[in-house]
């Protein structure tokens, strides 16, 4: 019986092994590993590391983390199994599910679904323990609302194509270049 190509190759490290190998070094660099996918079904096999940090993940950070991961993974015996290493950010479509996700998305606009069945679009402000401050439109102005994280059933960052309103950013405890007055 042929091996299942969806399962990691015996020569590739497991998800757990990759996390154990890289977690400490990523943390020292100021980043966390959100997920690792080891996929032997692709040709060549692929190891994808999803990382994030409080300052986000720009191209320089991705390059640095890729070099770091590559160097550490080179110490693992993968036999003759070639693989592609990919280091990436979680992406804008990742649901916000933890306090740190909300903290890292501060200043971004998000679509929120609440436990009472209502939904709203708001700019995310700071977190305070078990709640998040959000900025919502109120007529021609903006208001700050505090929402307990347990009341948020779904939250997804929205892509914006124009600069945010300066007042809205100020209320979200943000300053931003290019914000319109």
Curated annotation (Swiss-Prot):
Disulfide bonds: none annotated. The keyword Cytoplasm applies. Keywords: Cytoplasm, Ribosome biogenesis. Signal peptide: none annotated. It is found in: Cytoplasm. GO terms for biological process: ribosomal small subunit assembly; translation. Pfam families: DUF150_C, RimP_N. CDD domains: YlxS_C. GO terms for cellular component: cytosol. Its main location: cytoplasm. The keyword Transmembrane does not apply. Belongs to the RimP family. HAMAP family: RimP. Required for maturation of 30S ribosomal subunits. NCBIfam families: PRK00092.2-2. This is Ribosome maturation factor RimP. It comes from Mycolicibacterium smegmatis (strain ATCC 700084 / mc(2)155).
């Amino acid at each position: 019986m042929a091996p299942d190509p969806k399962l990691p190759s015996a020569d590739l490290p497991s998800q757990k092994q990759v996390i154990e190998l890289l977690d400490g070094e990523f943390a020292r660099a100021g980043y966390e590993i959100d997920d690792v996918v080891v996929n032997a079904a692709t040709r060549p096999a692929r190891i994808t590391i999803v990382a994030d940090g409080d300052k986000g993940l720009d191209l320089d950070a991705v390059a640095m983390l890729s070099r770091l991961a590559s160097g550490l993974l080179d110490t693992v015996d993968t036999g003759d199994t070639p693989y592609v290493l990919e280091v990436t950010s979680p992406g804008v479509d990742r649901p916000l599910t933890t306090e740190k996700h909300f903290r890292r998305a501060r200043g971004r606009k998000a679509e929120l679904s609440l436990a009472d069945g209502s939904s709203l679009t708001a700019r995310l402000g700071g977190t305070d323990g078990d709640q998040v401050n959000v900025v919502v439109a109120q007529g021609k102005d903006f208001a700050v609302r505090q929402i307990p994280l347990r009341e948020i059933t779904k939250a997804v960052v929205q892509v914006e194509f124009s600069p945010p309103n300066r007042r809205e950013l100020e209320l979200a405890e943000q300053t931003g270049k290019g914000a319109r007055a």
